[in-house]
Amino acid sequence: MKYFVKKSVLLVLVVLAFCACDNSNDNGDVIPPNPQSSKSVVNYTGEVEFVVDAPQIREDIEQDLKANPPFGGSKKYQFIIKRHSTLSPLYMLYAVNPEDDKSADGYTLNIAGKVESKDNYRLFSAASVHGWYKMDIVPVDTKDGKPVATYDVFMHQNIPSSTVDSKMYFCEDLTEKYRQKFPNEDIHAVVRRLVLSYVSGGDIINE
């Protein structure tokens, strides 16, 4: 009798397990799993740094860099990662308008591939030599999908696979640009980077 009860219980468990894994309806059609989506929001502060090695025209180049900052010169940013169970993650960056501190310009960050660190980036302190990616910056409201800028980007993470206390570096080597702008000047190097420093966030919002 005990043997029969054990076999009956085992049979019930097998049936329940099969039903739990079965994604078909009464007609035998396979029902795809419900797609799941979520987003995580991380707040950063932004600071622009640059190094100009051009003895005769350094001040003019520095003034030009200050007059044309990346992402509109914002000091506050929101980095958003949108995840979908059936799609690749979508990375977005919102630059808070410095004039009203409320509205924001949104950009999609498209990874264009891995790149090597450029020698001129060594002029910065804390410049990594590994884990660089080229990113195209595309405005959210664009109609043609064309990037407005391209940066060499790397992220420094104190905690692996976590944005807590992380820093993001958006770097650009502008040496050739300013050599063309000032062809008669001796310009050795012009590099600039936007440094995003972690403030708060990391919460996951299910959509």
Enumerate the language-model features and the residues they cover.
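Bacterial Sec-dependent N-terminal signal peptides
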Residues: 18-52, 196-207
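Predominantly extracellular/secreted and cell-surface proteins with exposed
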Residues: 75-162
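N-terminal export/targeting and maturation segments
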Residues: 30-78, 86
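Amphipathic hydrophobic-ligand
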Residues: 71-75, 131, 189-194
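Sec-dependent bacterial lipoprotein signal peptides
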Residues: 1-19
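Edge beta-strand at a domain terminus
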Residues: 165-207
